[in-house]
Structures are given as C-alpha cells and as structure tokens.
Amino acid sequence: MEGTAPPTPYDPASVARYAPEPDKRPGRTAFQRDRARILHSGALRRLAGKTQVVAPGEGSPVWDASPRTRLTHSLECAQVGRELGAALGCDPDLVEAACLAHDLGHPPFGHNGEQALNAFAEDCGGFEGNAQSLRLLTRIEPKRFTEDGSVGLNLTRATLDAATKYPWPRGAHPAVPASPKFGVYDDDRPVFAWLREDAPGARTCFEAQVMDWADDVAYSVHDVEDGLHAGHIDPNCLLADPEREAVFDAAVGRFVPAGTDHAELAAALDRLLAQDWWPHGYDGSAPAQARLKDATSQLIGRFCLAAEAATRAAYGDGRLTRYAAELVVPRETRMECAVLKAVAVRYVMQRTEQERLRADQRIVVAELAEALTARAPDGLDPQFRALFDAAADDRARKRVVVDQIASLTDASARSLHARLTGHP
C-alpha cells in the first residue's frame, strides 16, 4: 500500500496495489505514480502507430491533415476526462490515468483487427480490446515482478477499476449475455477479483463512467474533424434528407438502441446545425481550420457541461467518487454525440475503399496468427517467446500468440506478416 494517499474520499483500499510497494518519494500521490507509469509505458507509445479513423497518407493532397492516431486520441480523451472529473470531485490524476489506459489493449487495425483476433482466439477465450487492456496493465507491460511473475504496471485498485469499462467476463454482460463486450479473460480473474473487491455487482465506478464519456466525446468530435480535414465529409450533405437518413441508419443499433426513432436523431442533428459555430463548409484554409477548431471546442464544452450540470443536479455539490454516484448524461446530449459518431461512420468508415482496406486487414491478422502459431516460438518477440515456452497447454500458448499480435502496430503487423508469409 502507498505511504502517501491522495486526499479523501479515497480510502486505503482504493490506493492499494496488487503487489505492495513502498512509497518512493514523499508528497507524490499514488494516482500520480499510476499516471506516470502509464505515460512512460511502451504500450502507450505503440498507440502512435495505430490508426484512429483516417490513416496517415489518406488526407487531402492539398494540405497535410495530420490525422489522429490512437495515441493522440488517448491524450485528448485524458484532457477531457481530467477536467470533467475534477469538476465533479474526482482525483484528476486518477481519471487521467484511466483515460490514458483505456485503449492500450487496442490491436493493430482497430476494431477490424479486434474482430479478426476474436475469431482466431475463439477456442481460448476470445479477444476483446478492453479485456486486453486489463491484461496488459496487470501482466504484459513489464514494470514489477513478484515470485509469481509479472504484475504489469502494478497500478492501484482505483486506477485499474477506473480503466475497466466492462467489469464482467465473457458472456456475463448483465443485460445482454450474448454481447461481445467484456473486460476480463478467464486467466486474469484473480487480479480482476482483487480490483473489484466490494464493488456492487457489475456497476462501473464513477471515474470509469467519466472516462467512458470522455472517450465518447473525444472520438465523436475529433473523428468528424479528421473526416473534414481529409475531405471525406461535406457538411452540406447533412441538410439533405437521403443523406440524413443514411446517417441515422448508421446510428441506430450501433450508437443508440435499436428502434430509436429517426425523428429524435433528426432533432439532435438540427440542434447542432443551428449553432452559429457549426462548420457549414470547409476548404482547408487557415480561417476554415480556425472555425473548425472552434467548433470542436464548442462541442466538447457542450457535451461535458451538460453531463456536469445533470450530475450535479442529481447529486449536489460534494465530491463524487468511486461508487457514490452515477454520471448523468442527458438523453438529448447522448443523441447529439451519437449523431456525430454516425457521421464519421457514414462518410469515413463506410467508404468503398475503406471496406476493401478492412477486408485486407482482416486477412493480414488471420494469416499472421496462423503463421505465428505454426512457427512459434520462432517469430515471437523475446518477451512472448519466454511466455510461450512456459505456457502449460495449447490454449495458453495460443493466448501468447494473441498477446503478441495485439502488441503490434499497424505497420509492424504488416511487416511481420510479409516476413512470415512472403506476401506483401
């Protein structure tokens, strides 16, 4: 347990570590140490090589779009989460650490790679990026070792809990058992049970809810910004009914519940279009870029202030932490956020060339998994080679192969695939 705890209301259990450690420097909180460990991790650096929505090189030939990566998204999510969390009484370093950690388990090629790895790992427990994040934080990322092996970054209970978006194992979603979303693999259950001690059922802690909303806000706003920069989105299309209906179709069942009336989504979109800061055109000029940046700032402020006000209205002015409250996001605000996500899906991810690229990416991941399985331990990094040699059975060895692939960047996955298969 840390010798220096953050100010109340975080109790000693919240700042405990799975493997107890002495405090190295007085005056530094446990959550500040957690944040620093994540910032200095190789896993965070690797996110720079993982695409967010628009891959480098996909921008307009007229200007340098510098599209976001998973790393820049995580940094922006952390900034949004830190400020919203602080406004609601959370420890800001704790929320920032959770935001920085939330995508660490993301495999190459994003959710597309996640689907391909899940298919490959079906007989060893599947693959889910959030469960992989927990595995990375508590096992794979080298920082602390005990007699029983690696404990990963050995973060505090509260930080691990705040980084856990889906606090249940595969097939145990509290409302939809068939949901593909889960947050822990079977062989990581001991540390999961420890971090969830005294947690009420499948509830996420308040800081995890702040992290989750910060993630939604950051990627909904910035994915649209990147789509505009790259020339994939024409804001004027959102004024025409056929295009609007296509956006609403993309939202229903994906970002809002099935059966949501298109009229509710139309009202949400119209509220955004009516704002005087909404970008009704974009030509890449400096004034246009400034207007677009102002729009992104306005949207982030709009979404965060709505959540802050609604949560304060429900719980008052005290410090809201751990399991003392639920983040309240007005339905109208969630609808506005969902519409932005759907705009990015409709105009960026559903482009014909993107469909072809995603098919190619799935082939790369599937062939790479088979090639590594056939050659292992050859082809594995030294860290994973040792884990493969120590694995108790075929199921455990397959999980090591999955861990290796999940650690790769987009470019290193393609490079290793080409080297092992002979296919470019």
Curated annotation (Swiss-Prot):
Give the compositionally biased regions (Pro residues): 1-10
Query: HD domain spans which residues?
Result: 70-220
Q: Where is the composition biased (Basic and acidic residues)?
A: 20-31
Q: Which GO BP terms apply? A: dGTP catabolic process
Sorted alphabetically, the keyword list is: Hydrolase
Q: Which Pfam families does the record cross-reference, listed alphabetically?
A: HD (PF01966), HD_assoc (PF13286)
CDD domains reported in the protein's UniProt record = HDc
SUPFAM superfamilies, sorted: HD-domain/PDEase-like
Presence of keyword Hydrolase: yes
What GO molecular-function term can you cite, just one? Answer: dGTPase activity
PROSITE patterns linked to this entry: HD
Disordered: region residues: 1-31
Superkingdom in the source lineage? Bacteria
UniProt entry tagged with the keyword Coiled coil: no
Q: Secretion signal: which residues?
A: none
Under the heading InterPro entries, the entry gives: dGTPase, dGTPase-like, dNTPase_2, HD/PDEase_dom, HD_domain, PHydrolase_assoc_dom
Similarity comment: family membership: Belongs to the dGTPase family. Type 2 subfamily.
Output this protein's name: Deoxyguanosinetriphosphate triphosphohydrolase-like protein
Q: Which species is listed as the source?
A: Streptomyces coelicolor (strain ATCC BAA-471 / A3(2) / M145)
